[in-house]
Amino acid sequence: MSISNMTSTVWPDLQVPAIEHNHLPILTVALLTGIASAVYINVSSVQDPCKVGSIPTVKRPRLLDAYRSGVWWRIFVPRLVPYIEEGYHKYNKNDQPFRIWLGGFQAYAYVLPERYLDKIKNMPESEASFAAMANKYFHTGLPTGEVNNLVLQVASKLVNGNLATIKTLMQGEVQKALAREIGSPRQWTKINAWQVARKTTEAPGLRVVFGEELANDKTFVTGVSEFVSNITVYAFTLRYINLGPLRDFILYLVHWRHRRSLPAVLTPLNNVITERKKVRSNRHISDDEESFDCIQWALDQPVSDDCKTAEAIARRLVVISLGTIDTVAGVLVKQLTHLASHPECHEEIRAEIRECLAEDDNGWTLKSTGRMKKLESFIQESLRMSSGAISLSGMRIVTGSGFRLDDNTVLPRDSFIAIPTRNILYDPEVFPEPEKFDPFRFYKIKEDEKNAGSRSNRRDIRASWLAFGYGRQACPGRFYAINAMKTILGEILLKYDIRLAEKQAPRIDIDLDPMLAPVRSTDLEFRVRA
């Protein structure tokens, strides 16, 4: 039976023209192509039972991005922020997820719309894990050791739980650091903003993590400073090149030089830990004799013995120091630049600080800083404008059997999920005039909510402040970081006038997929207040 006759039998109303003999090769190719396509679609559906392939992809063309940005090296490291913005408005705003390639992680991120915040808020690590994401994509195990429960317990429970006492230490260390780095210049003096941020966060960070003895050891401090400073540099060396199956081996070799500098930190730290364990084994230590630092808190943790060896604790404390020093400094330098760019808010914030400190004779306590709502608003607005250290938050690796998006789509185990922080924070439906820096934006929002009381229909704006992550797996050291920023910025405002060294406001950060790296070349000018 000919094709024409067969078609007429099945669909009698369909008129099919007679097929000429010389058209048969073309039809044969078309038929085979159709069969191949059907087989491919069928096989693809079998290989993709969760239908992840149905999630749209936002592409990042390298050549086009280099042309658009006017920067030649964007061929190798294309920007991330503009393309997440594209996906946010095209898909997330329509309540759809999308995926985008992260060159720094060599993996696709599934970027979820805001409605999934409630779902990830209380997800346990057994279902989706931030620590697993950090270990896999930041390769924390290469230089020091993977993030584990000891790190999370010390950072989240003990550092945050002892903030009341830490605040006293923090104030003293910050004041000494400012005296060293800025001094008391009576004329406007140019100083690098990154240097100020780094040294003022380093001083309290070293004291809290490593204790008074090591924090005053110049050789140890230099070793920690150099090692921590290089973590981010080494973390992204060769990350943007697809190394295939040799990736882990090559990255291990890249970190070899970095690991060589680790003994300068670990040896004295091991000695202190070993000595403390020895003293505790020989006699009872009273509460008054207990050291007040992360070393002691790590020793007190109910974890397995193999996690409490001197070497294991030392390596994990180095990981914690990265968060208390380098990460906080990277955010603080942006806040210093914002502060210098907006002198119109200085006096109002100073007045509030003086009033709050006067009400509490003990100085920078949790109680007094908790009342500094305008200073807090400034910090929140700076974080909103700069998105902290990264343009995505809520980053997790799916560790359970899957992450269900809807009835038809499940992200399988090992999928990388995230929330588009920067775009939510720049959404005019969330924050009116998002491009404008309003230092008292959050102060006014909270005042409006307080005045409206239960009658307020305002959206919960706190759910959109995502710079420190979200939910039970948000940044474990966020309360320490916020209090450090308050203390440092407050002390600077009380003691100094501050302004930009250049008339034009400098660039705040650089889009380095996925990081928003701070610009370290910005200079500010300081002058001691009369």
Swiss-Prot record:
Return the SUPFAM superfamilies for the record. Cytochrome P450
Q: What is its EC number?
A: 1.-.-.-
Taxonomic classification, please? Eukaryota, Fungi, Dikarya, Ascomycota, Pezizomycotina
What catalytic activity does the UniProt entry give for this protein? Answer: preaspterpenacid acid I + reduced [NADPH--hemoprotein reductase] + O2 = preaspterpenacid acid II + oxidized [NADPH--hemoprotein reductase] + H2O + H(+)
Pathway, according to UniProt? Secondary metabolite biosynthesis; terpenoid biosynthesis
State a GO cellular component annotated for this protein: membrane
What is the name of the protein in this document? Cytochrome P450 monooxygenase sttB
Topology relative to the membrane, per the entry?
Answer: Single-pass membrane protein
Write out the annotated subcellular location: Membrane
State the InterPro entries in the record: Cyt_P450 (IPR001128), Cyt_P450_E_grp-IV (IPR002403), Cyt_P450_sf (IPR036396)
UniProt source species: Aspergillus terreus (strain NIH 2624 / FGSC A1156)
Keyword annotations: Glycoprotein, Heme, Iron, Membrane, Metal-binding, Monooxygenase, Oxidoreductase, Transmembrane, Transmembrane helix
Q: Which cofactor does it need?
A: heme
